[in-house]
Amino acid sequence: DARLLASLGAGLLLSFALPFVAFGLLRVMTNLNRLDAAAVAAHYGSISIVTFVAASSVLEGRMVDAEGYMVTVAAAMEAPAILSALWLVARVAPDDERMDATLLREILLNGSIVLLVGSFAIGTITGQDGLDDISSFIVAPFLGVLCLFLLDMGLVAGRGLRAVRGQLSFGTVAFAMLTPLVGSTLGLGFGLLIGLWAGGVALLMVLSASASYIAVPAAMRVALPEANPSIYLTLSLGVTFP
């Protein structure tokens, strides 16, 4: 299906490009240092699967049709943003260290990337029958585990809120509110260009507008431990997500 391939291509391109857009906005609008700006930018290129699920439920409730393969686009948009973020991290590393070969290996073999791509491949191979076999272990407890994870993320953001209050300037909060509008506008343009249904366009806008608070925080804690997690979690989870 040409439209499926075009949708995947658009999703990959948006996920690769949005961290660079976010990084540029952060450098102009905020006083964050380059390392924290790179870590924050990573979150705004990746996606929030919870927001995607919520948007899908809203569309279904309003009987607005969307392409079934948009969940595939969502899965494809997780990894590229992490790749872009890790590249940004390397470019802003202290002392301008050059780690081209090492960096490439680190990016391609990053644990989050391997798990995401590997899970996608396994799901493609096993299909619905494979999911049915393990649904009681994977599907049933998903929302409960996710709630616990979000509670933990909220605690982390809450504990760090006082510490980063001086850094969460008007510009920083404005960035967290403006960037989703930029992303959704780009998603709207690509969706209309591809010719997606109204629901598909809406979901691509949601994917482009959302900020990650699951996959990317875990990756940033490993790739950029010097960055302040309270900043990027507070912005993505406390400002953008609501």
What are these regions (language model features)?
Residues 2-153, 158, 165-168, 177-242:
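Alpha-helical transmembrane segments of multi-pass small-molecule/ion transporters
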